[in-house]
A protein has these predicted regions:
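N-terminal core-entry segment
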Residues: 1-110
């Protein structure tokens, strides 16, 4: 079996896997944390300028860019939403560690 087949098998198995309630709880916390950092960061510089520079009029409308509701390519939306989250994240306020894992992962996952 080649590597891509192994990866595909893993993805199929994960789609039907039942997650523990604690895993779902922590995933929800990561999404909420990401949104809480992304939303205020989206209106702070340099994010309005980044949106103006990266969103093209003819782009395929594949994924949403917050908070404007603009659509862009998947890569551009992930970049812009991730940049917004990183603008206002505070690494020192997460009680269980000095990080915000959602800021680096949720935008790309969506």
């Amino acid at each position: 079996m080649i590597l891509i087949e192994k990866i595909a098998d893993y993805i199929v198995q994960e789609q039907t896997r039942q997650f523990a309630p604690s895993t779902i709880h922590h995933a929800k916390r990561a999404v909420i944390d990401w949104f809480a950092a992304m939303y205020p960061g989206s209106v702070q510089d340099p994010n309005p300028m980044l949106r103006a520079a990266f969103i093209e009029a003819g782009d395929p409308q594949q994924s949403i860019v917050f908070p404007t509701g603009d659509y862009s390519t998947i890569k551009t939306a992930a970049f812009l939403n991730g940049a917004s989250a990183h603008t206002s994240e505070f690494d020192d306020i997460f009680r269980d560690g000095g990080l915000h894992p959602g800021c680096a992962t949720i935008a790309a996952a969506l």
